[in-house]
């Protein structure tokens, strides 16, 4: 069966490099499933989970918290260039919980002072923290 090579790259280096038979990511237009021999494509990614179903007898599924970036699909090679990315097994849940609480406090404070830019920034931080928490539970 044809498989794809999947790489997730961040400014800190390669976070993931495996073969897969199916990938699921979220773009601004919604969830996108990717199978081998997919058309060539470049698309932006949302802060969301990435599901990678590997081939083989065990049908292993890997989960990665993707915090924005782009996906490029070309000739059965899928490359994700992300601002940051963490595999489910690598997520520090207590740190993510603290980031969630901090973002919630910042949202409340920014809304009180009507600081729109600060509200937006804190909401992005909250989405990232919630994404990491959700992926850690997979």
UniProtKB/Swiss-Prot annotation:
Keywords: ATP synthesis, Cell membrane, CF(1), Hydrogen ion transport, Ion transport, Membrane, Transport. Produces ATP from ADP in the presence of a proton gradient across the membrane. The keyword Cell membrane applies. One of its GO terms (molecular function) is proton-transporting ATP synthase activity, rotational mechanism. CDD domains: F1-ATPase_delta. Belongs to the ATPase epsilon chain family. The gene is atpC. It comes from the Bacteria. One of its GO terms (cellular component) is plasma membrane. The lineage of its organism: Bacteria, Bacillati, Bacillota, Bacilli, Lactobacillales. F-type ATPases have 2 components, CF(1) - the catalytic core - and CF(0) - the membrane proton channel. CF(1) has five subunits: alpha(3), beta(3), gamma(1), delta(1), epsilon(1). CF(0) has three main subunits: a, b and c. It is found in: Cell membrane. Pfam families: ATP-synt_DE (PF00401), ATP-synt_DE_N (PF02823). NCBIfam families: ATP_synt_epsi, PRK00571.1-3. It is a peripheral membrane protein. The keyword Transferase does not apply. This is ATP synthase epsilon chain.
């Amino acid at each position: 069966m044809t498989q794809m090579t999947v790489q997730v790259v961040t400014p800190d280096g390669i976070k993931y490099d495996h073969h897969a038979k199916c990938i699921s990511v979220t773009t601004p237009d919604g969830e996108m499933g990717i199978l081998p021999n997919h058309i060539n494509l470049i698309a932006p990614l949302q802060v969301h989970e990435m599901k990678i179903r590997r081939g083989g007898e065990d049908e292993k599924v890997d989960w990665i918290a993707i915090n924005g970036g782009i996906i490029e699909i070309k000739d059965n090679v899928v490359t994700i260039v992300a601002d940051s990315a963490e595999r489910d097994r690598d997520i520090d849940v207590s740190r993510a919980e603290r980031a969630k609480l901090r973002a919630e406090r910042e949202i409340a404070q920014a809304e009180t002072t009507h600081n729109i830019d600060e509200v937006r920034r804190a909401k992005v931080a909250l989405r990232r923290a919630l994404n990491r928490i959700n992926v850690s539970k997979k």
